[in-house]
Amino acid sequence: MGRDIYKDETLTIPKGVTVDIKARNVTVTGPRGTLKQNLRHVDIEMKKQGNTIKFIVWHGSRKHNACIRSVYSIINNMIIGVTQGFRYKMRLVYAHFPININLTENGTVVEIRNFLGERITRVIKCLPGVTVSISSAVKDEIILEGNSLENVSQSAANIKQICNVRNKDIRKFLDGIYVSERGNIEELEE
């Protein structure tokens, strides 16, 4: 297999969003706030031309060419984050012992009590920019919201992971906190 001499991908920047690229440090600013991402470790040429960004790889191998789409997706998710935001909904699942959730420090720290009847309190600090709220419409549901997809999804994963059932048959003990729905905070009007 030979190498591709040139491969590129183009991302269009929507109105109301500004993207700054300096030495592969990307800053995206929109109506919901600002997100920054350091992409210096990726050997890709990024050029901003008007309202588009062009990602270029010269003489790239198969894995090097795959980096183009990864960087494209990262920056596209940042643009969606500063325009619409991200929301994850998680459901509390229990058979016998009801799981209690307390939110502290303005919804950035989650305390889980009475998981499988245990007396231990499990504490999860959410990543920066993520706020947690308890749903008023649905019983036993928490909502994670933020601008950064990476931070919101990793915070949801941390909450799910701390409630793993150990030393028991997981087919029988289905207790835990699971992601039930994910999407955007503000849906675009078509």
From Swiss-Prot:
GO process terms (BP): cytoplasmic translation
Gene Ontology cellular-component annotations: cytosol; cytosolic large ribosomal subunit; nucleus; preribosome
Cellular compartments annotated: Cytoplasm; Nucleus
Functional summary from the UniProt entry: Component of the ribosome, a large ribonucleoprotein complex responsible for the synthesis of proteins in the cell. The small ribosomal subunit (SSU) binds messenger RNAs (mRNAs) and translates the encoded message by selecting cognate aminoacyl-transfer RNA (tRNA) molecules. The large subunit (LSU) contains the ribosomal catalytic site termed the peptidyl transferase center (PTC), which catalyzes the formation of peptide bonds, thereby polymerizing the amino acids delivered by tRNAs into a polypeptide chain.
Alphabetical list of Gene3D superfamilies matching this protein: Ribosomal protein L6, alpha-beta domain (3.90.930.12)
Any Pfam family matching the protein: Ribosomal_L6
The entry's keywords: Cytoplasm, Nucleus, Ribonucleoprotein, Ribosomal protein
InterPro entries: Ribosomal_uL6-like, Ribosomal_uL6-like_a/b-dom_sf, Ribosomal_uL6_a/b-dom, Ribosomal_uL6_CS2
Protein's UniProt keywords contain NAD: no
Membership in a protein family: Belongs to the universal ribosomal protein uL6 family.
A Gene Ontology molecular function term of the record: structural constituent of ribosome
Superkingdom classification of source: Eukaryota
Descriptive protein name: Large ribosomal subunit protein uL6A
S-S pairs: none
Origin species: Schizosaccharomyces pombe (strain 972 / ATCC 24843) (Fission yeast)
Cytoplasm as UniProt keyword: yes
Oligomeric and partner information: Component of the large ribosomal subunit (LSU). Mature yeast ribosomes consist of a small (40S) and a large (60S) subunit. The 40S small subunit contains 1 molecule of ribosomal RNA (18S rRNA) and at least 33 different proteins. The large 60S subunit contains 3 rRNA molecules (25S, 5.8S and 5S rRNA) and at least 46 different proteins. uL6 lines the binding pocket for eukaryotic elongation factor 2 (eEF2).
Note: There are 2 genes for uL6 in S.pombe.
